[in-house]
UniProtKB/Swiss-Prot annotation:
GO biological process: 2-oxoglutarate metabolic process; pyruvate metabolic process
Database matches in Gene3D superfamilies: FAD/NAD(P)-binding domain
Official protein name in the record: Uncharacterized protein MJ0636
InterPro entries assigned: Class-I_Pyr_Nuc-Dis_Oxidored (IPR050151), FAD/NAD-bd_sf (IPR036188), FAD/NAD-binding_dom (IPR023753)
SUPFAM superfamilies named among the record's database cross-references: FAD/NAD(P)-binding domain
Recorded superkingdom: Archaea
Phylogenetic classification of the source organism: Archaea, Methanobacteriati, Methanobacteriota, Methanomada group, Methanococci
Any one GO MF annotation of this record: flavin adenine dinucleotide binding
């Protein structure tokens, strides 16, 4: 058990996304009386509008890409399934996941309240944890736009799409809808995917992976915003709601914490949100028991961008690197005919400090991250074959 003896304190967690649910479950599991407030649906942005939903779209796009490679010509989504049918099937899967999340949350003793948490509720609780997500604009320069919450409700596939933003979500949407057969234009003020700094990797992405038009000109953007034939999607980062100290305590508040995307100075993706949720749960216990508080650790966070190739990266990108050939297996077999990407492991002062990969099995990157931390996960390593894992051959003892 994380906390030891059960507690009788009453705690409100506001928001049932990855951060809030993680905090609530950890606290309830260890004896706290926890009410989890959710005004929408369990799962937060991740399940309902973000990474999980986009995974469904991406998997369909990968099917289309493989068929296009095999046929030697572009296959469009509507030749296989209507966009309306695809959306409905994804929604059914989301419902199943949502029901599972709700069940496991309640089984741990969390009381889920499907209503808005209001100021009048504050006096009913000893501690409050906010995990409410970001605020997102609903218009851009006065023009109505779709946001991440609108896209799952679309039932007709747009012919022309303008996407505003240059980050991971914007790029993933642009890639998916282009794979579906839409004419996609992405506007970004500078360049896309800024965290990828390796110029050789960027050059490969632009030539081999990016399948949509990118513009930077404001006048061209304005013309497209005025063009009624374009569906406009705004995919820029929203704004956090709460500023906290290093221990995720909300500033100028007593016994109030915050975690996840609602942080002005934190959040970022689902694993980070969960980690912050765990830190908040631990710190509430520590505060009660006069123990030192802990800080969230934002070092060496693995990240993934799912385009026609999956790009994953962690750590530093330096000028001292080794290029590793891709391995062929589940997820990239037919891509051998069109390109399976490049991979690099980066070094500094003789030590491994990072990597960028284009392998389908992005899930193995956290194990490589442990190697950067000095934990030899590849000692006596036995692989599954065939595998697209590029690391084990390089580092197995």
């Amino acid at each position: 058990m994380l906390f030891g003896e059960s507690m009788t304190l009453k705690i409100a967690v506001v928001g049932a996304g990855p951060a809030g649910r993680t905090s609530a479950m950890f606290l309830a599991k260890n004896g706290f009386d926890v009410d989890l407030f959710e005004k929408d649906r369990v799962g937060g942005t991740c399940l309902n509008y973000g990474c999980t939903y986009i995974t469904g779209l991406r998997e369909m796009a990968d099917i289309i890409n493989n068929l296009s490679i095999l046929k030697g010509e572009k296959v469009h989504l509507e030749e296989i399934i209507s966009f309306k049918e695809l959306q409905e099937k994804i929604n059914k899967i989301q419902d199943r996941i949502r029901n599972k999340l709700e069940k496991e949350t309640k089984e741990l003793g969390v009381n889920i309240k499907y209503k808005e948490f209001k100021n009048k509720h504050k006096n009913d609780y000893d501690y409050i944890i906010y995990a409410t997500g970001r605020n997102y604009p609903s218009n851009y320069n006065g023009y109505e736009v779709l946001t991440h919450k609108d896209i799952p409700n679309l039932r007709e596939l747009p012919e022309n799409i303008l996407i505003i933003g240059g980050g991971v979500v914007a790029t993933e949407y642009a890639s998916i809808f282009s794979d579906f057969g839409c004419n996609v234009v992405l506007y970004t003020r500078s360049k896309i995917l800024k965290e990828i700094k390796d110029e050789e990797i960027r050059d490969y992405l632009m030539k081999k992976v990016i399948n949509f038009k990118i513009i930077n000109d404001k006048e061209e953007l304005e013309n497209l915003l005025k063009d009624e034939s374009y569906t406009k999607i705004l995919a820029i980062g929203g704004n956090g709601r709460f500023k906290t100290d290093d221990y995720l305590r909300v500033l100028n508040e007593e016994k109030v914490y915050a975690c996840g995307d609602c942080l002005i100075n934190g959040g970022g993706n689902t694993p980070i949100s969960r980690m912050e949720g765990r830190v908040v749960a631990q710190n509430i216990y520590n505060e009660i028991n006069n123990k030192p508080l802990i800080k969230p650790n934002y070092e060496l966070i693995p990240k993934t961008i799912r385009l026609s190739l999956t790009i994953s990266y962690v750590g530093k990108q330096t000028n001292n690197y080794k290029t590793i050939r891709s391995c062929v297996g589940k997820g990239n077999f037919f891509k051998v005919l069109s390109g399976v990407g490049i991979n690099k492991i980066y070094y500094e002062d003789g030590k491994i400090v990072g990597a960028i990969t284009m392998m389908p099995c992005a899930e193995i990157l956290p194990y490589f991250t442990q190697l950067i931390r000095g934990i030899d996960v590849y000692n006596n390593f036995m692989e599954v074959h065939p595998s697209t894992d590029i690391f084990y051959k390089e580092f197995r003892s």
